[in-house]
């Protein structure tokens, strides 16, 4: 069995969402792939293909492990353990899980959540148990909480339900209709500009010290109001850029991110950083008439470029 799960971007509202305002997230087709197969050994074998790492655990060990002691395997192991517990299954046959991912790590695209959700789906499917989306999302959220100490529903819910979500106060609603149809026809670039210099928690703490942050968040919320009504790429791109300018006022951008956003504005419809900031990724709304020039300019920078579209 092979499971493919998306990653996610924040289109609007990062940081504001911490303070009870809205964020708009989108599942994208930068995916991770989880393959699960039965084996003849009494073992659970995990292969992280991109890191060229493997781990084997005896079947009776899995229930008693602390996943946090297993480094790069921790999300996958926690997802296996919690799914088996939830389904009340004592594994009797061994299985092997192969994990591959196109998603750059530690840059706000939900790489760990993608692997977590994929593993939950793979393990439940392996035992012919069909979990509902709300069960999968809840299990995924609990894995992230167990590993990270605290978590937001944004990554696990967006990756489970796909499409477009409006997140507020750790709850969400799925956005359908004209807005979803409009975004289906948009082509984006994710540009991994630079390694993040600070962790999300540090950036959130720094934003907390900004005196006029509430005014900035209210402006971001107005941008979301406008964006949800728009049906043309030019205006949507301008709102992405406006959101970026507001994020700059929170001091979470960097000169490199600003440079990539500027290229995205000149040769695309618009651009913004996505995620916590302090480095990481920029999302650009592609103007296909200028795409060659856009790629030419981006390739002068030391960046990684990923084509993506909404995944539903």
UniProtKB/Swiss-Prot annotation:
Optimum temperature is 70-75 degrees Celsius. Highly thermostable. Retains 100% of its activity after 24 hours of incubation at 70 degrees Celsius. At 90 and 100 degrees Celsius, the enzyme shows a half-life of 15 and 5 minutes, respectively. One of its GO terms (cellular component) is cytosol. It holds the Pfam family GHMP_kinases_C. It catalyses: (R)-mevalonate + ATP = (R)-5-phosphomevalonate + ADP + H(+). Its EC number is 2.7.1.36. Homodimer. This is Mevalonate kinase. It comes from Methanocaldococcus jannaschii (strain ATCC 43067 / DSM 2661 / JAL-1 / JCM 10045 / NBRC 100440).
